[in-house]
């Protein structure tokens, strides 16, 4: 029986730099996204050299990381360096990994919108599923199996039609979308590389995490933006889908710390990262409006339900069936006991504080740039 090669005691310590300092070089896919930008900030503060893979687009898509350039006006790089690449192109991944020789890889790049994955099912599978395999294979091709640690952004959408409440690392998966199914393949191929090649590879099963940097087509950010516009008189009403969907919402800033902690653990293990608290979309709406001094009262049922302002009588929220998913995920609640015990991690930002931060940030943004 063939034996797996021995794993380095610390992949981070490989290739010591000057004066015997450990070489801390991170490669982040999805660096321009919400999580990627917070993770880049976090790692730069820890003294890492950070490399990010960005897709080429006709307009700059680096808004969330502009401030991390040495000279943001001239896009002059300091300890953060960007490389054009794509998870659908294995050649470029091999080239970048061979050039950078990272000690830690964080695979955050994905088509991450669940509803859109029903329209872009094949693309989602290619990027989120096979893209993860391409990245892992690139590590193997470059001979870095024993000197790199690999973090895979897994998701609570793996649980989908939940088999137990709350969901933990041992809960059976039942994805309910092309996104969830693609991420399920990614989850298992990471486990396979860990077991077959002794790669230090982990899955972070992250429950919903939000921030002012959340993409505008995600429900929480759609709510905070719309509420800000209503407060500023730029909008009167907006539409949502399933108001009673319940989620475990945390702050992205807390969750990127958990990603890093997983790679500092002695052994590669998968972890659920969550708050353990559940709130509905309806509740997110109500709390958002309270932050601009409005009380929402609900009238009607199902697609005819509306949210009316108690103070003015104006309808600010309606329901539109087009925002429902073909197969809904009604309830997600994570149990992060393992992360608390083994990583000493816990969420810091409470739900109320998260909602307040998002609404206030969007009020400032919409005040200066209504079309942002």
From Swiss-Prot:
Active site: 155, 157, 179
Keyword terms of this UniProt record: Acetylation, Lyase, NADP, Phosphoprotein
Acetylation is among the record's keywords: yes
Catalysed reactions, as listed in the record: GDP-alpha-D-mannose = GDP-4-dehydro-alpha-D-rhamnose + H2O
GO MF term set: GDP-mannose 4,6-dehydratase activity; identical protein binding; NADP+ binding
Pfam families: GDP_Man_Dehyd (PF16363)
Binding, NADP(+): 30-35, 55-58, 86-87, 108-112, 123, 183, 209, 214
Activity modulation comment: Inhibited by GDP-fucose.
Enzyme nomenclature, EC number: 4.2.1.47
Phosphotyrosine PTM positions: 323
Tissue specificity statement from the Swiss-Prot or TrEMBL entry: Highly expressed in pancreas and small intestine. Expressed in thymus, protstate, colon, heart, placenta, liver and kidney. Expressed at low levels in spleen, testis, brain and lung.
Residue list for modification N-acetylalanine: 2
Any GO CC annotation of this UniProt entry: cytoplasm
Entry-linked InterPro entries: GDP_Man_deHydtase, NAD(P)-bd_dom, NAD(P)-bd_dom_sf
Disordered: annotated span: 1-20
Pathway(s) served: Nucleotide-sugar biosynthesis; GDP-L-fucose biosynthesis via de novo pathway; GDP-L-fucose from GDP-alpha-D-mannose: step 1/2
Highest taxon listed in the record's lineage: Eukaryota
Role summary: Catalyzes the conversion of GDP-D-mannose to GDP-4-dehydro-6-deoxy-D-mannose.
Name used for this protein in its record: GDP-mannose 4,6 dehydratase
Gene, per the UniProt record: GMDS
């Amino acid at each position: 029986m063939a034996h797996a090669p021995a794993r380095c005691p610390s992949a981070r310590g490989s290739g010591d730099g000057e004066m015997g300092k450990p070489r801390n070089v991170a490669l982040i896919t999805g660096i321009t996204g919400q999580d990627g930008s917070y993770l880049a900030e976090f790692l730069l503060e820890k003294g890492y050299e950070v490399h990010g893979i960005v897709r080429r687009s006709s307009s700059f898509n680096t808004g969330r990381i502009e401030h991390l350039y040495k000279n943001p006006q001239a896009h002059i790089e300091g300890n953060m360096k960007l490389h054009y690449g794509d998870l659908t192109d294995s050649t470029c991944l091999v080239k970048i990994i061979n050039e950078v020789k990272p000690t830690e890889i964080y695979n955050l790049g994905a088509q991450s919108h669940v509803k859109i994955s029903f329209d872009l099912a094949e693309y989602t599978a290619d990027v989120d599923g096979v893209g993860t395999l391409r990245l892992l294979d690139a590590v193997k091709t470059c001979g870095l199996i024993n000197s790199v640690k690999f973090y895979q952004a897994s998701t609570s959408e793996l649980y989908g039609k939940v088999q137990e409440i709350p969901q933990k690392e041992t809960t059976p998966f039942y994805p309910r979308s092309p996104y969830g199914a693609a991420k399920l393949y990614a989850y298992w191929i990471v486990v396979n590389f860990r077991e077959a090649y002794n790669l230090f590879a982990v899955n972070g099963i992250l429950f919903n995490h939000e921030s002012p940097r959340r993409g505008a087509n995600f429900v929480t950010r759609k709510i905070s933006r719309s509420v800000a516009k209503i407060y500023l008189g730029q909008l009167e009403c907006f539409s949502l889908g399933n108001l009673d969907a319940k989620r475990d919402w945390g702050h992205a800033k807390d969750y990127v710390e958990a990603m890093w902690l997983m790679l500092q653990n002695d052994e590669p293990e998968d972890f659920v990262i969550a708050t353990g608290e559940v709130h509905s979309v309806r509740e997110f709406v109500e709390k958002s409006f309270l932050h601009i001094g409005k009380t929402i009262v609900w009238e009607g049922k199902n697609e005819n339900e509306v949210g009316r302002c108690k103070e003015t009588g104006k309808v600010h929220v309606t329901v539109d069936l087009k925002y429902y998913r073909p197969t809904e995920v009604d309830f997600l609640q994570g149990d992060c006991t393992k992360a608390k015990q083994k990583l000493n991690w816990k969420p810091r930002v409470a739900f109320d504080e998260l909602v307040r931060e998002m609404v206030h940030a969007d009020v400032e943004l919409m005040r200066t740039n209504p079309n942002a």
